[in-house]
């Protein structure tokens, strides 16, 4: 029996909740002038929307030129290879967010990523306010997500659109 969009969304959100307690290490694919680029990023989600902090460089330049991206979130499978592989691919449009251009969305991303919490754990102090204006965040709004789960028997793939 085929699953409805709401059921697939719940499966995806459960996967993200289960494996994203702290953050997700993801692979972000961007492209410009037929030159693909894949960059590891640490992201967090608000529903199906993903946020991450982005250092200046190739990924931001590619997003400025072509906001169509693909983000892969996966769980390393270890020695069992495909016996318990789980992950998803998310196709969507990326937006670069700065405090200066969109303070409300920036603060939402800041809270979603939990930069204060990360700063307390890493440096034993809150995130410095003076640094906020220097940060760029990326927000990805998906239009398609493919979730894959293999238990070693019959793999399943669910597509959310």
Model-predicted regions and their roles:
Residues 1-25:
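Extreme N-terminal tail/first-helix region
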Residues 2-3, 83-161:
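Charged, gly/pro-rich active-site loop segments
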Residues 21-27, 118-122:
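Short Pro/Gly-enriched beta-strand edge/turn motifs at strand-loop
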Residues 23-56, 71-75, 89:
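Short beta-strand segments
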Residues 33, 58, 78, 142-146:
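Short acidic/polar capping segments at secondary-structure boundaries
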Residues 53-57, 70-77, 114-127:
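Short acidic (Asp/Glu) patches
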Residues 58-61, 153-155:
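Short, surface-exposed beta-strand-loop junctions and turns on beta-sheet-rich folds
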Residues 61-97:
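Helix-adjacent hinge/juxtasegments
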């Amino acid at each position: 029996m085929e699953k409805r969009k709401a059921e697939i969304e719940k499966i995806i959100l459960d996967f993200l909740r289960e494996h994203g307690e702290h953050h997700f290490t993801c692979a972000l694919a961007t492209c410009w002038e037929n030159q693909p680029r894949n960059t590891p990023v640490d992201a967090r989600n608000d529903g199906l929307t993903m946020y991450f902090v982005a250092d200046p460089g190739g990924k931001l330049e590619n997003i400025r030129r072509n906001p169509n991206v693909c983000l892969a979130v996966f769980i390393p499978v270890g020695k069992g290879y495909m016996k318990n592989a789980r992950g998803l691919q998310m196709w969507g449009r990326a937006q670069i967010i700065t405090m200066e251009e969109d303070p409300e969305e920036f603060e939402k991303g800041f809270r979603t990523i939990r930069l204060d919490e990360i700063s307390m754990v890493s440096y034993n102090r809150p995130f410095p306010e003076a640094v906020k204006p220097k940060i760029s965040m990326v927000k990805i709004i998906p239009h398609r997500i493919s979730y894959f789960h293999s238990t070693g028997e019959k793999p399943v793939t669910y597509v959310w659109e």
